Design a protein with these regions (language model features):
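Alpha-helical transmembrane segments and their membrane-interface junctions
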Residues: 79, 84-103, 163-176, 229-248
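Membrane-interface interhelical loops and short amphipathic "cap" helices
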Residues: 1-11, 101-115, 166-178, 241-246, ...
Length: 401
């Protein structure tokens, strides 16, 4: 398929994915907050478990949580499910557009694992499917009722999946695939557990029967799981913009840490919504972020040290830098790319003009020296010595004369 069409598909499907994701996560946050804010009605009413008054958009809203009789089933009953389904469907399409087209250029990194295209796609889809099957088995079985034990097992399995993806895929792809796994668990919870429980609830009401209490309990459990996964998934959605995370040597450990921090912050708000203000959680989460920033600080030696650079303390000539860029970068980052996959310069970054190279010097260092995120999968074979030269050139002022 023409790269121009791929680029437009990427844009449109990504836009849909973001829109539906906002709708889904927004609904999740709202209903978790709503359940915690319900209070007994001022004027007690039969079957009304709680109510909430709100003001928004210039009007007053009264919400009631109630059990109803068959005759009271409304003609129109809104189900919150298509937000989840649409997010997952668009996400899977986006995964295919980005990682399965172009012979898997974003998926396969030969320096990590020498995979064929078919093997890479099989690992991708197989792991996503297997993750849901194992997770659902744990929580649908008696094991899911063992208190904190299944929680710890689930965390360990997730951490194992994170490590697993980093053994096979490029770091960008590994991060996004973890997000795909978590998104699949979330939509699986909606599709296979929450909506079926709600369907049985409606059917019981229509039949004049008392709904099984276990249905609501299990659905609420899966909904809570989704609630804790939202912040980590949102981070993963934006992570590809930050190579200081996915391109770090300990990228898998960074992702695990951020997932734990995100779930912890979500826990703070869940407790707060129930009236328990454990304010200490936020400073601890912030301290963890600052610790992560400190621990993952890049090693400065790459731009100062290697024995392979023969210039010593001499000035790095721009002619040498220009040669490196022409050999390693311009095949993609040009007004007329010659790469077999990219027909348009990624992110519109072009190195044809020397003044533009000077303006982009800091970005060049971040991507190719500090994080070693570029060239993508080191497709053009940039050497350690060449990265050192680029880093020193930027440190010297990025002169183009």
């Amino acid at each position: 398929m023409d790269s121009y069409i791929i680029e437009w598909l990427n844009l449109v499907v990504r836009w849909i994915h973001v829109i539906t994701g906002i709708a889904w996560i927004g609904a999740s946050f709202f209903f978790n907050w709503l359940d915690s804010q319900l209070t007994p009605p001022e004027n007690p009413q039969p079957k009304v478990e709680g109510e909430l008054w709100m003001i928004h958009s210039g009007g007053f809203y009264q919400l009631k949580k109630t059990m109803i009789s068959p005759s009271e089933i409304p003609r129109v009953l809104h189900w919150f499910k298509w937000e989840a389904y649409s997010t997952w469907i668009s996400g899977i399409f986006l995964l295919g557009i980005v990682y399965y087209t172009g012979s898997g250029v974003y998926l396969i990194d030969s320096e990590i694992a020498d995979l064929s295209y078919g093997m890479a796609v099989s690992i991708s889809l197989g792991t996503i499917l297997a993750s849901w099957l194992v997770y659902d088995f744990i929580w649908a079985s008696a094991l899911g009722e063992k208190g904190w034990f299944p929680v710890m097992i689930s965390f360990l399995l997730l951490f194992g999946i994170i490590w697993w993806f980093h053994q096979w895929f490029g770091s960008r792809a590994a991060y996004i695939h973890v997000g795909a796994v978590m998104g699949t668990l979330m939509v699986g919870n909606v599709w296979r557990r929450i909506i079926p429980s709600q369907t049985k609830l409606v059917e019981a009401v229509k039949a004049g029967k008392t709904p099984e209490a276990s249905l609501g309990i299990k659905a609420k459990q899966r909904s809570l799981h989704n609630n804790y996964m939202t912040l980590p998934v949102v981070f993963i959605m934006i992570s590809n913009h930050f190579p200081n995370t996915f391109a770090h040597y300990f990228n898998w450990a960074i992702l695990i840490t951020i997932i734990v921090i995100g779930a912890t912050v979500r826990h703070f708000f869940n407790l707060k919504n129930k009236g328990h203000l454990n304010i200490w959680i936020l400073p601890v989460a912030m301290a963890a972020i600052f610790a992560l920033i400190y621990v993952t600080k890049p090693d400065a030696t790459i731009s100062n040290s290697p024995d392979t650079v023969t210039f010593g303390t001499e000035h790095i000539p721009y002619a040498l830098v220009r040669t490196i860029l022409d050999q390693r970068c311009v095949s993609c980052h040009s007004s007329r790319p010659t790469d077999d996959v990219f027909r348009i310069a990624p992110k519109g970054i072009m190195f044809d003009n020397n003044e533009r190279v000077h303006a982009l010097a800091t970005l060049i260092k971040i991507q190719s020296v500090t994080t070693i995120a570029m060239p993508l999968g080191n497709k053009t074979g940039m050497t350690h010595e060449e990265r050192v030269i680029l880093g020193r050139w930027v440190d010297e002022g990025a002169s183009i004369k």
